[in-house]
Design a protein with these regions (language model features):
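Contiguous beta-strand segments within globular domains
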Residues: 85-103, 191-212
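Short, compositionally biased P/S/T/A/G/V-rich stretches that sit at domain boundaries
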Residues: 80-88, 166-199, 279-280
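C-terminal "exit" segments of structured domains
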Residues: 53-132, 137-140, 144-145, 151-157, ...
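Solvent-exposed serine/threonine-rich low-complexity stretches and specific carbohydrate-binding patches
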Residues: 122-134, 226-240, 273-275
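Surface-exposed, short loops/turns at beta-strand junctions within beta-sandwich domains
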Residues: 145-148, 246-253
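Conserved structural position at the C-terminal beta-strand
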Residues: 156, 258-260
Length: 280
């Protein structure tokens, strides 16, 4: 899986695009990514479950923190991407008690601010114990240990292309999602990965493997994180970590999310980062 793409556009000297932005925005408001980001980068990152983070040329030496921390944080608890015209946008997501540490990687092409709020509503203090806060021209990367459970919030202020991804170190994992079809020799039939594309508006069988208990449901989401449709997957009677059920994809592009509750009753969610594509 390709996890990170650093856009080359972020390493170029600002041109008229950035100059137009600066004429509208407060003085000193940085705008990394001098030209429009190549959509090929964005699509490749989305398809593989990776992300685009825009670094200025002067920040290249500090970009390694994203890959170093990414190796430690394998579970996606939240992700969204899109384009912010102007203003701000808030994102909320649950953090459960199984999470040992979190990695926030938020990139916004023309960043005014990126703010992280704890469940209490207090802003995350960069100097707090266990917090490694890294700020860039076009975003923020924060690694923190032992986050308190509850609903966290990220607010981005600015404009342009954005990716907001939150990953965790946790034993609860949605580690496999696959569309399958019935096959095998007579008397030895079973489900195998589909060899044909996923089809739009047709019934197909979906399997998911979850490490962890307390699963309450599955759903499809789009690239922006909005729910598209609920999914009725049932646990295998012989293996409570395996789930399967018929699915009729009603949207062309989607991701799969599992939701549940931990042993203390806190809600959790895990996102399978790969973007699925359904063809007519």
């Amino acid at each position: 899986m390709l996890r990170y793409l650093v856009s080359a556009m972020a390493l170029l000297t600002p041109n008229s695009f950035a100059q137009q932005q600066s004429s509208q925005n407060p003085p000193g408001w940085p705008c990394a990514g001098a030209r429009a980001v190549d959509p090929t980068y964005v699509q490749l990152a989305e398809n593989t479950g990776g992300e685009v983070f825009l670094f200025d040329r002067s920040e290249s030496a500090r970009s390694l923190v994203l890959m170093q921390e990414g190796m430690k944080h394998k579970e996606t608890v939240f992700r969204t991407s899109g384009t912010l015209a102007r203003g701000y946008r808030d994102f909320q997501f649950p953090v459960d008690t199984t999470i040992e540490s979190l990695l926030f990687s938020i990139s916004l092409q023309c960043t005014q601010s990126v703010v992280i709020y704890r469940p209490s509503g207090a802003e995350l203090d960069a100097s707090a114990p266990g917090v490694d806060d890294n700020r860039y021209h076009a975003g923020r990367i924060v690694a923190m240990s032992r986050p308190e459970p509850g609903v966290w919030q990220v607010r981005i202020v600015g404009s342009g292309l954005f990716f907001a991804v939150v990953e965790a170190k946790s034993d609860v994992s949605l580690h496999s999602v696959r569309f399958v079809q019935l096959g095998g020799r007579p008397g030895h039939e079973g489900y195998f990965p589909m060899t044909t594309p996923v089809r739009l508006n047709l019934p197909q069988m979906l399997q998911a493997s979850v490490s962890g208990s307390g699963v309450t449901g599955f759903r499809m989401i789009n690239s922006g994180g909005a729910t598209l449709q609920p999914l009725a997957l049932a646990a295998d009677e012989n293996d409570q970590e395996e789930f399967q059920g018929p699915v009729i994809p009603s949207h062309k592009d989607f991701r799969i999310v599992v939701e549940g509750r931990d042993s203390r009753g806190y809600p959790y969610q895990r996102i399978f980062p790969r973007l699925f594509h359904a063809e007519p």
